[in-house]
């Protein structure tokens, strides 16, 4: 727990600063990035290394050496440039001094008057002081779309922490990203990943997957040196982002799928043949070079992703950054890609990722999409499995916008050949089981698992970064490389396992976030509620999961958020870690268990659970970190507290030990095309912004008549009156937007609400209707992601270091696009490409 007590249990007062208790001051060097030149953003020129004085204490270590130590608080204030009387330069006595960190300094970069910044900051802090922290920041995902998104977020969090707002009702951090909060998470996971029958699951971070498998890495323009700290050793980071991602996979920081350059079933067989465990065999084969990670050679045919199922995602019409790269390299179809790869440009190639001169086009053999409408992804698919819509199926719905569990209730049968999602996957499982006979039996599968957050080995590399392939350490599964686990796959019985609740919940219980509790009572109840399987075989007498409602009941009964008895057990499990009793947070609802029929009658409010850091209480509105502050539950971090400072070696190397201003990166996508292929109209360069969809929900229903009427009936892009005037563009003109990543053809919406310098396209406007051809590509105009490309940030690859460790949908690489720019010009000819298709 985080009680203020010493090791003997005595009350103590923790020292925040050494301002009045020090052995002198030391000059500390801080990296500065605000002076980085950018064609479209204003720099503030200062030395790229700033020295500031910090108070220190001298500590004598066991070996007799003396070290100077400082508190994080003192280092933080020095980072902000606050003059506290310790002498030295690069500090400010008032807000008007032009020193990095002051309101005057930021005014040069942002154009926001310093008086406005000072006013808002004072009002925010004053409100927090008067109300005990009831100042709140509500933020959407827009800030998360910049390359240095984590620096943006850390800036907000720092302000909240310093004002005492975190974990206070009515204050703190309210992050909104849409209908994305999976509240009954621990009930859903066994069902979603088959954890009731076999563990661990094979999971992957999507951003790295598509970066490699759609060959976006071959076109990388951002040099790692461009974002490295001036205090770092550049020779240690001579590699590319692709290389660093492969290193992260090799050290167990990030997952990989495909994993190795051999079939994992064959690896298990080979290990058995030589009498070794799979772990020993894989380690030995990796060391002698007979085996390698798939991502070290992503263009080798044996490492292609051959089949892909897309469900609950419009990958090719909405979410997939680097759309044209996916069309070319993943699908092997027509594309609008204009850029040259590293080989064609004669640029430096990756050091650890094998380069093949001939880039593959069409890695996928099979693309299957489940959707209830013919979206862009469905149009590109080999097979489309029509799914039921909201009123044709039974399902669960939760959100971060309210604390209720909602049902989707089947009012009518699915139309025509469509089926519910559950029935489709149930049918796939049945067909696979039938086809497996004589081909695949009970097989052993070798699964590589990264070093996961909230597990005992999450602190696998506490004393720096060691790469076994470079000879810096031995390859030790679960410590210096991924954990290697053999999992049994019973293919002929896949259907029986899919339609029943497996025995691992009886034997191992359930849990989440590092906690675990017994679930035998819940399994027994589900056997009575859903009835038990009567057929002979592996699932005999197990609780049945035949229908979508059966599946919903499993989720509801296993999750502490919807079963009070489980919630009490979960809080008790947490108490075993903290040494404090937390069961009072749920004991009043111990006999409350939400059934599917309950939420059909009325949406039900969830129960407080230790899976989340806020409370669902009649007197406390949900607030992130409320239980950390009021129940003294440690944050799941290296220190157990909120951290201003991150001391991981890569964080330091990239200048992100502390939060600081990082300007947008230069994606270098404009120069190769600007004024090079003119159509006679003026070309201008604008910042590419893609807000949340205006006339629909993500990619749903934006193509019906009502929505199209509201949005002018086809793709539209918004730009300012000033920019439109300078380029001779009038409202409703057809314009083209392009860079080396691809091109878009759309109509212009000229608006005074848009700031000069930016151009805005609401996301998920698909290319399925009223989309003419692009003049520059000769193919149909693209979607909002046609002009973007995935650019990985190395610090998002860190693992094995407490909170800096991979977790499914928690931490890993992410795609960004706000740093991107496009060339905008008026179109001369609008070609609808209506000529007959020739084969």
Language model features: what each stretch is:
Residues 66-79, 84, 161-380, 484-727:
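Extended redox/cofactor-interaction regions of prokaryotic respiratory oxidoreductases
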Residues 105-109, 139-146, 178-180, 314-315, ...:
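Conserved short loop/turn motifs at secondary-structure junctions
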Residues 353, 364-366, 372-373, 411-433, ...:
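Phosphate/diphosphate-binding loops
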Residues 376-408:
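Flexible glycine/proline-rich, aromatic-decorated loop/lid segments
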Residues 131-136, 167-174, 340-341, 438-445:
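Flexible, glycine/charged-enriched surface loops at secondary-structure junctions
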Residues 1-131:
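Long, well-ordered, tryptophan-enriched scaffold segments
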């Amino acid at each position: 727990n985080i009680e203020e007590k010493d090791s003997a249990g005595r009350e103590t007062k923790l020292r925040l600063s050494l301002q009045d208790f020090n052995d002198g001051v030391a000059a500390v060097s801080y990296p500065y990035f605000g002076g980085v030149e950018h064609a479209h953003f204003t720099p503030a020129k200062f030395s790229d290394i700033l020295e500031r004085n910090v108070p220190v204490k001298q500590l004598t270590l066991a070996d007799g050496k003396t070290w100077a130590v400082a508190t994080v608080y003192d280092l933080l204030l020095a980072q902000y440039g606050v003059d506290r009387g310790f002498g030295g330069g690069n500090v400010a006595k008032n807000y008007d001094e032009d020193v990095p960190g002051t309101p005057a300094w930021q005014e040069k970069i942002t154009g926001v008057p310093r008086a406005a910044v000072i006013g808002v900051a004072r009002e925010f802090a004053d409100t927090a002081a008067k109300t005990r922290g009831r100042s709140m920041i509500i933020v959407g995902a827009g800030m998360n779309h910049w390359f240095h998104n984590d620096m943006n977020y850390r800036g907000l969090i720092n302000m909240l922490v310093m004002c005492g707002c975190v974990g206070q009702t009515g204050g703190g951090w309210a992050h909104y990203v849409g209908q994305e909060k999976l509240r009954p998470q621990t009930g859903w996971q066994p069902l979603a990943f088959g954890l009731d029958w076999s563990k661990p699951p094979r999971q992957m971070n999507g951003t790295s997957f598509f970066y490699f498998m759609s060959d976006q890495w071959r076109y990388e323009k951002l040099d790692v040196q461009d974002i490295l700290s001036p205090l770092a050793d550049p020779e240690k980071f001579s590699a590319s982002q692709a290389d660093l991602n492969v290193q992260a996979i090799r050290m167990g920081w990030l997952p990989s799928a495909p994993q190795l350059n051999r079939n994992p079933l064959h690896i298990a067989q080979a290990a058995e043949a030589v009498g070794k465990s799979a772990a020993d065999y894989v380690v030995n084969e990796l060391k002698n070079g007979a085996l390698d990670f798939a991502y070290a050679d992503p263009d080798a045919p044996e490492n292609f992703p051959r089949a892909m199922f897309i469900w609950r995602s419009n990958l090719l019409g909405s979410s997939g950054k680097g759309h044209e790269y996916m069309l070319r390299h993943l699908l092997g179809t027509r594309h609008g890609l204009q850029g040259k790869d590293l080989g064609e440009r004669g640029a430096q190639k990756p050091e650890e990722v094998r380069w093949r001169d001939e880039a593959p086009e069409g890695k996928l053999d099979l693309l299957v999409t489940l959707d209830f409408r013919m979206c862009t992804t469905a149009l590109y698919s080999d097979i489309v499995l029509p799914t039921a819509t909201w009123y044709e199926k039974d399902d669960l719905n939760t959100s971060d916008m309210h604390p209720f569990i909602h049902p989707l209730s089947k009012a009518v049968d699915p139309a025509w050949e469509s089926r519910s999602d559950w029935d489709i996957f149930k049918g796939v499982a049945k067909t696979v089981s039938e086809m497996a006979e004589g081909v695949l039996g009970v097989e052993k599968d070798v699964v590589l698992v990264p070093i996961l957050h909230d597990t005992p080995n999450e602190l696998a590399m506490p004393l720096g970064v060691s790469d076994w392939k470079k000879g810096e350490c031995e390859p030790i599964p679960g410590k210096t490389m991924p954990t290697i686990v053999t999992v049994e796959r019973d293919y002929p019985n896949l259907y029986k396992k899919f339609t029943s609740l497996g025995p691992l919940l009886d034997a191992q219980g359930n849990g989440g976030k590092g906690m675990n509790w017994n679930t035998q009572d819940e399994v027994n109840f589900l056997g009575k509620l859903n009835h038990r399987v009567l057929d002979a075989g592996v699932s005999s007498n197990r609780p049945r999961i035949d229908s979508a409602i059966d599946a919903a009941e499993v989720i509801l009964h296993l999750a502490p958020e919807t079963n009070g008895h489980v919630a009490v057990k979960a809080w008790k499990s947490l108490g075993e870690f903290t040494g404090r009793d937390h069961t009072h947070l749920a004991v009043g609802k111990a006999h409350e268990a939400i059934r599917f029929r309950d939420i059909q009658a009325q949406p039900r409010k969830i129960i407080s659970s230790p899976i989340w850091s806020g409370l669902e209480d009649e007197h406390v509105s949900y607030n992130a970190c409320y239980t950390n502050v009021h129940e003294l539950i440690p944050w799941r971090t290296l220190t157990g507290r909120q951290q201003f400072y991150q001391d991981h070696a890569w964080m330091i190397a990239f200048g992100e030990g502390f939060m600081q201003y990082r300007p947008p990166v230069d994606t270098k996508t404009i120069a190769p095309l600007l004024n090079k292929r003119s159509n006679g109209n003026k070309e201008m360069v604008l910042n590419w912004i893609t807000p949340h969809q205006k006339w629909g929900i993500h990619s749903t229903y934006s193509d019906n008549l009502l929505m199209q009427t509201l949005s002018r009936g086809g793709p539209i892009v918004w730009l300012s009156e000033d920019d439109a005037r300078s380029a001779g563009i009038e409202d409703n003109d057809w314009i083209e937007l392009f860079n080396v990543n691809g091109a878009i053809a759309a109509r212009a919406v000229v608006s005074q609400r848009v700031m000069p310098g930016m151009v805005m396209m609401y996301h998920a406007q698909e290319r399925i209707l009223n989309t003419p051809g692009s003049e520059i590509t000769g193919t149909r105009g693209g979607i909002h992601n046609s002009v973007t490309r995935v650019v990985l940030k190395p610090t998002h690859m860190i693992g094995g270091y407490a909170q800096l460790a991979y977790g499914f949908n928690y931490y890993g690489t992410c795609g960004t696009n706000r740093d991107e720019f496009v060339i905008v010009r008026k179109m001369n000819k609008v070609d609808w490409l209506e000529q007959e298709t020739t084969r």
